[in-house]
């Protein structure tokens, strides 16, 4: 009996069915593999759990997930996403899954060769067109000690438009930034507490670059570094798509790790798979460190420096000689007029230079320091009128970039091996510091006169009886020592808290919680040497004190030298304890550091202390490395 050959339509149907049956297990295997792939885990911000198997997403917004278990179930979230992006559009197409999550949609379709449904994402396409982005630039704003959120610096991304005739106005470009969504009435102390321990949602936002410059450069006096990223057009597209996915969605903000810099690293990891920048983060993400990691991954093509308004004004004043600076200060403060005899005695070029520098200073003070308009506006007008009748000096190129960028300074993690003598006993010691910089660290790449230490542990092992002790446990220690002059009069200040060894009248030394602070002034003597005068206050709390606590007002007079090869801090500090054990404590101290490049330093210190009618001589020698 002859075999019957199926008709063509039936044969096609059978073949399609057999292919579907054979493809289903393959797609199942593909989905299981994709659920733990690096790119999927990055897209949904999954990270391995530290103390158990599995993953947890750092996204804290339920709307970021399609699966109810999506926060901890990568495979379940992938399957739910595939179902969502494959469903037909109903209602507003802009609410469709592929429009809400275009980066996920594009990646999944590429991996599984899924057909594209007929869904038009008008809002997303209009948003991209409005941003008009050809390239991405990572921008680093230098540290700003007067704000807890910016003490370590700040990073954000600039979305650069296509160049038109080589003259693109980057001030009009947009930026991507991540920050804590804090209430306006929250104090800096509350902000610091909630930023450290949690409590603020973090929000990714898009805003114009000129607004960022106004805040960071013009008002907060922070220099900006611009790092052009060498992303391809496809990588730029992927970054924008993922920004659309996460903007206005909550990722809880933490000051030391899940901060502005951390979120931007995640965006770069999404744009260029395999960079694994987030793998560098352990306990904290310092913005300058994150920039260093980006540079080390060869992600940067060019670097540009944008000085702050204060840096530019200071540079203009520095071009004047001492007599011209005196005249500029007198003009700005209204002691002399623009047509006074001292000004008219100058030749045209010097007069123009003085008027230019004074005008820039007055305008800066009016904006950054809120000089009254009724004073600043008339004076600015008088300076402009006087200047308009003069031929200008050769155009100044403005301040030169620092020799060392912030990302080129020493690493922020420090480890030191020490040895010394505390007046009666010898010891060896170990110091560990999580971050960031102190006055005697190699200064290149850091703000002169600025100190910010976070989580520093000093330990000792005494050689006579092998007794181990914690000498200091510093939670946070900040010092801002900016020199004063005729134009700028910043307040020098310091604050810190933690635990430290305190000597009792019996001679015993106990670990005591403390809070300390101070305020005063700093004056530059030479380019590298400054004099400090600080009024201080200390609070110690301990059950070993007669009243459980003690308070000490005091003063600290010192000299500070910061140099690339050698740094020195020496002075006299005195404080009077007035509550529990009423007595005075005086200390003459000398601390120095020899810098062996930016990775190592040798430190030595010595002091002579008078405390409880006893004199003690202390010294310490150590080797410090930065990681």
Where is each model-derived feature located?
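N-terminal accessory segments that precede or flank the first globular/catalytic domain
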Residues: 24-192, 344-479, 523
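Active-site nucleophile-His-acid catalytic modules used for acyl/amide transfer and hydrolysis
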Residues: 209-284, 540-542, 625
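Long, charge-rich alpha-helical interaction segments
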Residues: 289-375
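Transmembrane beta-strands of outer-membrane beta-barrel proteins
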Residues: 413-415, 430, 453-457, 489-495, ...
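Transmembrane beta-strands of outer-membrane beta-barrel pores
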Residues: 419-425, 436-438, 458-465, 477-479, ...
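Outer-membrane beta-barrel "beta-signal"
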Residues: 432, 615-627
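Repeated loop/turn-to-beta-strand initiation elements of outer-membrane beta-barrel proteins
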Residues: 438-445, 452, 480-488, 524-532, ...
């Amino acid at each position: 009996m002859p075999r019957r050959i199926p008709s063509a339509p039936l044969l096609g149907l059978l073949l399609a069915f057999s292919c579907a049956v054979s493809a289903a297990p393959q797609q199942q295997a593909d989905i299981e593999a994709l659920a733990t792939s690096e790119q999927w885990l990055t897209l949904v911000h999954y990270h391995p759990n530290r103390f158990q198997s599995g993953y947890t997403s750092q996204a804290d917004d339920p709307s970021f997930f399609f699966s109810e278990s999506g926060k901890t179930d990568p495979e379940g979230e992938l399957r739910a996403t595939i179902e969502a992006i494959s469903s037909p559009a109903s209602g507003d197409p802009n609410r469709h899954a592929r429009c809400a999550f275009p980066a996920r949609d594009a990646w999944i379709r590429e991996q599984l060769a899924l057909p594209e449904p007929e869904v038009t994402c008008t809002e997303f396409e209009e948003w991209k067109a409005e941003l008009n982005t050809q390239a991405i630039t990572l921008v680093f704003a230098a540290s700003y000690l007067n704000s807890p959120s910016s003490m370590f610096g700040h990073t954000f991304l600039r979305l650069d438009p296509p160049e038109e005739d080589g003259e693109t106005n980057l001030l009009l470009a947009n930026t991507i930034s991540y920050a804590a969504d804090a209430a306006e009435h929250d104090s800096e102390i509350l902000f610091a507490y909630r930023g450290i321990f949690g409590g603020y949602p973090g929000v990714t936002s898009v805003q114009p670059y000129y607004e960022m410059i106004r805040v960071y450069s013009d008002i907060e006096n922070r220099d900006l570094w611009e790092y052009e990223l060498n992303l391809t057009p496809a990588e730029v597209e992927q970054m924008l798509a993922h920004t659309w996915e996460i903007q206005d969605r909550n990722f809880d903000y933490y000051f030391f790790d899940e901060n502005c810099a951390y979120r931007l690293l995640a965006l770069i990891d999404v744009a260029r798979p395999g960079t694994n920048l987030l793998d560098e983060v352990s306990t904290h993400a310092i913005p300058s460190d994150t920039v260093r990691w980006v540079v080390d991954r060869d992600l940067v093509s060019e670097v540009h420096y944008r000085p702050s308004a204060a840096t530019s004004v200071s540079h203009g004043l520095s071009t004047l000689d001492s007599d011209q600076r005196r005249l500029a200060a007198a003009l700005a403060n209204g002691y002399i007029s623009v047509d006074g005899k001292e000004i008219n005695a100058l030749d045209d070029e010097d007069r123009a230079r003085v008027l230019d520098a004074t005008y820039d200073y007055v305008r800066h003070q009016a904006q950054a320091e809120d000089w009254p308009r009724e004073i600043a506006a008339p004076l600015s007008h008088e300076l402009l009128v006087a200047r308009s009748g003069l031929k200008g000096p050769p155009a100044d190129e403005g301040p030169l970039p620092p020799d060392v960028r912030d990302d080129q300074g020493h690493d922020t993690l420090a480890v030191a091996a020490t040895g010394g003598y505390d007046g009666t006993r010898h010891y060896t010691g170990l110091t560990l510091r999580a971050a960031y910089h102190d006055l005697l660290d190699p200064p290149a790449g850091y703000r002169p006169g600025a100190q910010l230490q976070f989580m520093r542990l000093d330990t000792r092992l005494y050689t006579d009886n092998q007794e181990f002790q914690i000498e200091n446990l510093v939670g946070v220690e900040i010092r801002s020592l900016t020199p004063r002059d005729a134009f700028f009069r910043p307040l020098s200040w310091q604050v810190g808290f933690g635990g430290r060894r305190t000597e009792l009248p019996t001679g015993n030394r106990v670990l005591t919680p403390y809070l300390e602070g101070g305020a005063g002034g700093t004056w530059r003597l030479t380019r590298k040497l400054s004099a400090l005068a600080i009024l201080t206050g200390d609070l110690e709390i301990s059950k070993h004190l007669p009243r459980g606590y003690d308070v000490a007002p005091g003063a600290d007079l010192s000299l500070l030298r910061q140099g690339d090869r050698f740094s020195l801090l020496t002075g006299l500090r005195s404080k009077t304890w007035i509550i529990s054990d009423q007595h005075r404590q005086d200390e003459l101290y000398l601390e120095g550091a020899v810098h062996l490049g930016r990775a190592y330093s040798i430190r030595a210190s010595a002091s002579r202390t008078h405390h409880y009618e006893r004199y003690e001589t202390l010294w310490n020698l150590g080797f410090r490395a930065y990681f």
